[in-house]
Regions:
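Conserved redox-active cysteine motifs that mediate thiol-disulfide chemistry
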Residues: 52-53, 60-77, 81, 86-96
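Thiol-/selenol-based redox modules, centered on thioredoxin-like
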Residues: 160-190
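Alpha/beta-hydrolase fold active-site loops
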Residues: 54-56, 112, 162
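Sec-dependent N-terminal signal peptides
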Residues: 4-14
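Short, internal strand/loop/helix patches
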Residues: 115, 120-169
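Extended hydrophobic-aromatic, low-complexity segments
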Residues: 27, 48-49, 58, 66-71, ...
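N-terminal "domain-start" segment that seeds a small globular fold
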Residues: 20-48, 70, 80, 188
């Protein structure tokens, strides 16, 4: 009886510690809250939680990944583009889009924030790439450490390439790698 109780207590401790580790290192799943992301932007630390209540286009890039660099350049031009989604009367139109997590409608006053996160180990490399690619430095963020970059890559399943995600106002992941038309519609609200 005593051995059984010790065994049960040991299993409870084991499962409790395993579930805590899973919570700390959970992966992004559609329709669920995104993993924690904290980045540095112009000397300040910013948490993804600070964007609660807003739609977020979360884009990861690295200086050594030409595809993600081209995506950043394309996204920057879409954000700076003055075009908006308008209906025939010239008023801002509602945006409707479908994702694997559900169907969404963004009203006329919906704001979309863009968070571009660089995963380079070197801040100097990022700064040089921002300069070379003519990106606006104030819109670019970076991870604080190589360990953070590794954790984020794992949490967002980016082992085979960097990606862009759409997060709803409740902090749930609703879309990965949106096509250009969806991205243009979303970014017309930024």
């Amino acid at each position: 009886m005593k051995k059984t109780m010790i065994l049960i207590a040991g299993l409870v401790v084991l499962f409790t510690s395993v579930s805590a580790a899973v919570d700390d290192h959970r992966t992004a799943r559609f329709g669920e809250e995104t993993p924690a992301v904290v980045v540095e932007q112009q000397g300040s630390r910013i948490s993804l939680d600070a964007y609660r209540g807003k739609w977020v286009v979360l884009s990861f890039w690295a200086s050594t990944d030409p595809v993600s660099r081209m995506d950043q350049t394309r996204m920057a031009s879409m954000v700076s583009d003055d075009s908006t989604a308008c209906d025939k009367s010239g008023n801002d139109a509602e945006i409707e889009f479908r994702t694997s997590a559900g169907n969404y409608t963004l009203g006329n006053n919906t704001q979309v924030e863009v968070l571009s996160v660089n995963l380079d180990k070197s801040p100097e490399m990022m700064a040089e790439t921002v300069r070379l690619d003519n990106l606006q430095g104030s819109t670019q963020s970076r991870v604080a450490s190589a360990a953070d970059a590794e954790r984020i890559c794992k949490a967002f399943a980016m082992e085979k390439g960097l990606r862009t995600f759409v997060i709803d106002p409740e902090g749930r992941l609703v879309m990965a790698d949106p096509d250009e038309a969806s991205l243009r519609l979303l970014l017309s609200r930024s």
